[in-house]
């Protein structure tokens, strides 16, 4: 993970309503009237800052941009119950936000969800979120499969329950073994320690138990006439690349492979991610 999260940008830190919930967000507006609003949803242990390197380029491309912290992430408060952080309830919250942004069809919304945020974004669409296009970035058809990332969740969950979030943070820093720039290390530490414990636990449960809902999503997208893009880094180590390709085929979705990136293209190679996203999004908007 590179220093992209601390990329300087011209976005404004705001709070937005999502149903009965208030979410922290970064908002960037183009000079001319926006062609659409791009809503960017981070993954497990992530935050709106994961999209920092995308904000100004997307704005320059004529889009309004809204990157959010999900409930319980970094600067967004959240409920105390772990089950409120599963993809379904978070998806309903996100759907409420998208519905407000769409203004009864007067504003087009491009929804992008990364990793766990992709599971939440699909739940939002299944809850009726009125989107013009859906992008699943480094996400999968259901629960996170066996591998290093799944094993890390299995290791840290009991520690989080018994020892607390600060001990888990120390454990993660030891496991990482990468010397980040001080400003980035400070951000990553602050956002993890600011996370709701119930949120970390609930999302971990979601990552291990979410069912395959691809057939259901494909039907919903087809009925609504909404296009879909499945994008992933060429070295993604969360959901295997063949799994994501198969998901795209089942969804009737386009595929974009981001070179020089693994599980987090927005931070690992944001320029290549933008090169993949923008032509497809422009085509969707032209056709809608």
Q: Which stretches of residues belong to each language-model region?
A:
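Conserved HGGG/HGGXW glycine-rich cap/lid loop of the alpha/beta-hydrolase fold
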Residues: 24-77
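Gly/Ala-rich beta-loop-alpha elbow adjacent to hydrolase catalytic centers
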Residues: 113-117, 121
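Conserved alpha/beta-hydrolase catalytic His-Asp/Glu region
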Residues: 144-150, 164-222
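Active-site loop/oxyanion-hole signature of alpha/beta-hydrolase fold enzymes
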Residues: 21, 67-112, 275
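Flexible "cap/lid" loop of the alpha/beta hydrolase fold
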Residues: 122-126, 130-162
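Conserved loop-alpha-helix segment in the C-terminal half of the alpha/beta-hydrolase fold
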Residues: 223-261, 267
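Catalytic active-site module of serine/aspartate enzymes centered on a nucleophile-bearing elbow/loop
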Residues: 252-288
């Amino acid at each position: 993970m590179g220093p992209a999260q601390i990329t300087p940008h011209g976005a404004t830190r705001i709070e937005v309503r999502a149903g009965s919930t208030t979410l922290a967000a970064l908002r960037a507006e183009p000079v001319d009237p926006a062609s659409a609003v791009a809503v960017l949803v981070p993954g497990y242990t992530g935050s709106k800052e994961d999209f920092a390197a995308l904000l100004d380029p997307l704005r320059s491309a004529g889009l309004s941009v809204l990157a959010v912290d999900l409930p319980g992430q970094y600067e967004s408060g959240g409920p105390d119950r772990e089950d409120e952080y599963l993809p379904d309830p978070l998806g309903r919250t996100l759907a409420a936000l998208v519905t407000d942004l769409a203004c009864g069809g007067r504003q087009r919304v491009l929804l992008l969800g990364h990793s766990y945020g992709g599971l939440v974004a699909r739940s939002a669409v299944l809850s009726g979120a009125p989107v013009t296009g859906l992008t699943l970035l480094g996400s999968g058809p259901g629960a996170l499969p066996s591998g290093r990332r799944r094993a890390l969740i299995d290791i840290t969950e009991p520690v989080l329950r018994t020892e607390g979030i600060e001990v888990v943070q120390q454990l993660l820093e030891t496991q990482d073994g990468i010397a980040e720039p001080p400003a980035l290390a400070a951000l990553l530490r602050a956002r993890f320690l600011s996370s709701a414990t119930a949120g970390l636990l609930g999302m971990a449960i979601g990552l291990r138990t979410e069912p395959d809902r691809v057939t259901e999503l494909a039907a919903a997208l087809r009925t609504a006439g909404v296009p879909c893009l499945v994008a992933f880094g060429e070295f993604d180590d969360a959901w295997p690349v063949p799994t994501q390709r198969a998901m795209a085929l089942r969804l009737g979705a386009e595929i974009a492979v981001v070179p020089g990136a693994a599980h987090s293209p927005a931070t690992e190679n944001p320029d290549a991610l933008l090169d993949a996203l923008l032509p497809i999004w422009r085509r969707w908007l032209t056709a809608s």
